[in-house]
Swiss-Prot record:
Species the sequence originates in: Aspergillus fumigatus (strain ATCC MYA-4609 / CBS 101355 / FGSC A1100 / Af293) (Neosartorya fumigata)
UniProt remark on domains: The CFEM domain is involved in heme-binding and contains 8 cysteines and is found in proteins from several pathogenic fungi, including both human and plant pathogens. The CFEM domain adopts a novel helical-basket fold that consists of six alpha-helices, and is uniquely stabilized by four disulfide bonds formed by its 8 signature cysteines.
UniProt GO MF annotations: metal ion binding
Disulfide cross-links: C26-C67, C30-C62, C40-C48, C50-C83
Region Disordered, residue ranges: 94-171
Official protein name in the record: GPI-anchored hemophore cfmB
């Protein structure tokens, strides 16, 4: 079974080589793999192969891996020539363009990732600073409120103290007056008693 598969691949490679005599040997396996999987009836049916939009994208990466720059250029020329002869001309990207595009894409992706990471880090720092400032502001507000309450209590006590003193003074004055009135009444009673005794004796 393995021998039959190998023979089939070699036969297909021979057909591809015969159909594309200017194609380097390093690219034959690439052509066999791509042309045998695109749905066309045979490997040599380039009128069909060249109408497949995926032809170039399927063959190019394999050729870039297997062949050097000079051989890649030869493959591009051979494919363009063969498809033009089959009545279905195609265009092939310049050799090295795909690699350059892939490199630029990777660089752009990396830059975007770094930018996103930097933005996320800045946002995190900003959020942390805001969170740290909020408790400090709350503490300051609480301290100010506590100080205001203490001052208000002190002022209330201070204002109440004179009133207490006034009340004490009033009470003392009332007691004194009451005492004086009692003394006067006692004196008057004494005088009346003496007068009554004198009248009795007379």
């Amino acid at each position: 079974m393995h021998f039959s598969r190998t023979s089939l691949i070699l036969f297909a490679a021979g057909l591809a080589s015969a159909q594309l005599p200017n194609v380097p040997g390093c690219s034959l396996d690439c052509f066999v793999a791509a042309l045998s999987a695109d749905g066309c009836s045979s490997l040599t049916d380039f009128a069909c192969h060249c109408q497949k939009p995926e032809l170039v994208s399927n063959i190019t990466p394999c050729v870039q891996s297997a062949c050097n720059i000079a051989d890649q250029s030869s493959v591009s020329v051979a494919v363009v020539s063969q498809c033009s002869a089959a009545g279905h001309p195609i265009s092939v990207p310049p050799v090295g363009a795909a690699s350059t595009t892939a490199s630029e894409t990777a660089t752009t992706t990396e830059s975007s990732t770094q930018t996103t990471t930097g933005t996320s880090s800045t946002a995190s720092k900003t959020s942390s600073s805001a969170a740290s400032s909020t408790p400090s502001s709350s503490s300051a507000s609480s301290s100010h409120h506590h100080s205001s309450s203490s001052a208000l209590t002190t002022r209330t006590l201070t204002s109440t103290e004179p009133s207490s003193q006034s009340t004490s003074a009033s009470a003392a004055a009332t007691t004194t007056l009451s005492g004086n009135a009692g003394s006067e009444k006692a004196n008057v009673a004494g005088v009346v008693a003496v007068a009554a005794a004198a009248l009795y004796l007379l």
